[in-house]
Amino acid sequence: MRVTDFSFDLPDELIARYPMAQRNASRLLTLDGNTGTLADKQFTDLLGMINPGDLMVFNNTRVIPARLFGQKASGGKLEILVERMLDDKRILAHVRSSKSPKVDSIIHLDGGYEMKMAARYDALFELELLSDLTILEVLEAVGHMPLPPYIDRPDEDADKERYQTVYNQNPGAVAAPTAGLHFDDAMLDALKAKGVNIAFVTLHVGAGTFQPVRVDNVLEHKMHSEWANVPQDVVDLIAQTKAAGKRVVAVGTTSVRSLESAARASEGELKAFSGDTDIFIYPGYQFQIVDAMITNFHLPESTLIMLVSAFAGFDHVMAAYQHAITQKYRFFSYGDAMFVTKKAH
């Protein structure tokens, strides 16, 4: 299986650089994983596709303003992108500058804050905040929303709201769980009123989600690691849902990866899970938990299009993407969505 198998040509004008005026105003392409049948819908039509008793699982991570700008002691400019918060004072981060800062050197951030370069681990740096404030307080004060590289514009005030789900709760992500961006409070209320059950897991999406796959053979790819939490109450709800013959619908690839990570950690029998996961899902993977998923359109050759292909069949997914391009769907984080049902193995 070659990475290039997952390639497609995307016209630049189909990359969504801004969100729709209303969250749920996006289009929705439905894909039946068993038959490959496609249908063009609106996102609000999803209400008619989720049944009473089905369980929808959302990722409630909160995107932190993870991009910082500052200067080295020499005066050279640098940019810091937080990969994860280690504690209240320390971060693991990518640092972009003409020359890498030295260990033990001081970095002067915008706003007058200072950080010490504590250690280096290959491409990542450990930085320590020299302040009475917490990392989160400094990020909220001077950090910028970490828009993906393909959005290709500076972040704006509106992104602080729109590059964030309405149900976000646990700060720590440096990229949004984008399938969730389409839901507003009214739609969540309508789902609950219909008898759909709602549950939340947490996966702090890392910057690694944008890293290209740099090997030719898919099997040689080393997945980045992210922190996930699947609490016991969600495990219990999933068991009840399955026992009643209803579906588990994951909102986004991060929810899929959280649930499947928990199943993998307990060898197929779902138990509560909290810790790092580097689960890499590609065609051939047997899904343990998830029956249907909502997801945006992903980058060519990305691990995310591989995951969707594993779920609904490679040929079906690549055909769906060609259809989406022909029909001018909007792609990537601020783009349109798919509702995909699982292909039976």
UniProtKB/Swiss-Prot annotation:
Q: Which domain of life is it from?
A: Bacteria
Localisation per UniProt entry: Cytoplasm
The record describes its quaternary structure and partners as: Monomer.
Stored InterPro entries: QueA, QueA_dom1, QueA_dom2, QueA_sf
- Which reactions fall under this protein's catalytic activity? 7-aminomethyl-7-carbaguanosine(34) in tRNA + S-adenosyl-L-methionine = epoxyqueuosine(34) in tRNA + adenine + L-methionine + 2 H(+)
Which keywords label this protein?
A: Cytoplasm, Queuosine biosynthesis, S-adenosyl-L-methionine, Transferase
Pathway the protein takes part in: tRNA modification; tRNA-queuosine biosynthesis
Which GO molecular-function terms appear in the entry? S-adenosylmethionine:tRNA ribosyltransferase-isomerase activity
> GO cellular-component terms in the record?
cytoplasm
Protein family membership: Belongs to the QueA family.
Listed name of the protein: S-adenosylmethionine:tRNA ribosyltransferase-isomerase
Q: Does the keyword Transferase apply?
A: yes
Gene name, per UniProt, is queA
Q: What is its main location?
A: cytoplasm
Organism the protein comes from: Shewanella sp. (strain ANA-3)
Say what the protein does: Transfers and isomerizes the ribose moiety from AdoMet to the 7-aminomethyl group of 7-deazaguanine (preQ1-tRNA) to give epoxyqueuosine (oQ-tRNA).
Q: Its Gene Ontology biological processes?
A: queuosine biosynthetic process; tRNA wobble guanine modification
- E.C. no: 2.4.99.17
